[in-house]
């Protein structure tokens, strides 16, 4: 039977519960255990799909088409286990399911209440589908004391009593701030956070304390005494130079040993951390640097591009170089020459996005890369802008545009109205809902034999990648674009939807309709990112 580890947070938000959960999952996995990670999000949205990137950050898409929290990206990258829609749930989804059952009459006239109906739904979600796993790590979003989180805390409180003895523990991630004027770490915020947790019936078994320095023995003793945990269970979560150093740092601090001890488990074997050590050696001791410009719309909120940042880092690890990112708001050069902003970089990446704001700047970035032979990687919206640039400046279709921006005589990019998902036809309309109505999840693509992208994928002629988009390049313009050098080297199996474009006579210019960053791992960098950074390395030696 699976054992459960519930991870909560206190004092402040954004302490890194998702990263801590992923790192602990990786440590348990490195000891030979089968691990599953799940996220409970207390907000009322059904999913983050329609939330602003400035508020929520990236929307991470799973193979089965779920739009989920970015923490699931950490889970995948650290454990290699693909997440599914069954690994993330929100208050909104729970309420929707309960109200649907109530309308059907499933509750036989009962009064629907937070306890027991909402808490039971949360417990059912947490316990479902875990038979094949040794450990299930469950992260509760938000911080202790948030009103919207109370049903989730109540549910995990009940679960510990309902599960067999020694089958559930609580880890509380907290902050130990250093006050320079006092010259010491302060434990009071953590004490009050644990007091709040205990007031709702949850006694943490382990304290994971975020800090920028070593925790003195006296402070450990104080935390153990006032928070009612063993001194050995006060774990130091020291700041590290890169996120892939976290598993080794947490192991050195004794987190995985303390977790096993809390369950009464004798460690099988020491964790196999050699691969993590290799990654960190490459990150800390690169053989060179490359600079990549990210020309985007949400550059003020780096979390909006979380998987992208990590995938570029993985490309650097594969090539033993440090990837420096130059964030450029695409509006900056909508009406001026992009050269002063881009002539120093070794590669240009235009990521996914929505809406007209900044689009012309992205088109100019694609033109600069094409004309100057700078490696260009266009992802989703970035591919569409590269196609519009080619249509305008190579084919001569000066009014080429996307219907996403309004009516146009030359719709190079248009709304997808139907596509196949397996054997089922899915349809969308301009007037439909925004939430959950995109082409979402993993779809196959057929690669042109002998194309550069086929070579990047090791000679493959069929791939599967994750999508999140409503608009698609119009194949009616395919022949004219190919006559001017822009090759459609990847199509959907039915040949209707363009998936990949490239210039054969360019050092490296590839646009993809999907999001390859979602499948990149530190141990297994996505081939497109590894190849893109390799091209940037070559470019850096030419400058």
From Swiss-Prot:
Additional remarks: CTPSs have evolved a hybrid strategy for distinguishing between UTP and CTP. The overlapping regions of the product feedback inhibitory and substrate sites recognize a common feature in both compounds, the triphosphate moiety. To differentiate isosteric substrate and product pyrimidine rings, an additional pocket far from the expected kinase/ligase catalytic site, specifically recognizes the cytosine and ribose portions of the product inhibitor.
Biological processes annotated in GO: 'de novo' CTP biosynthetic process; pyrimidine nucleobase biosynthetic process
Family membership noted in the UniProt record: Belongs to the CTP synthase family.
One annotated GO molecular function: identical protein binding
Top EC class, one word: ligase
Protein role: Catalyzes the ATP-dependent amination of UTP to CTP with either L-glutamine or ammonia as the source of nitrogen. Regulates intracellular CTP levels through interactions with the four ribonucleotide triphosphates.
Superkingdom in the source lineage: Bacteria
Binding of CTP, residues: 13, 146-148, 186-191, 222
Protein name (database record): CTP synthase
Organism: Bradyrhizobium sp. (strain BTAi1 / ATCC BAA-1182)
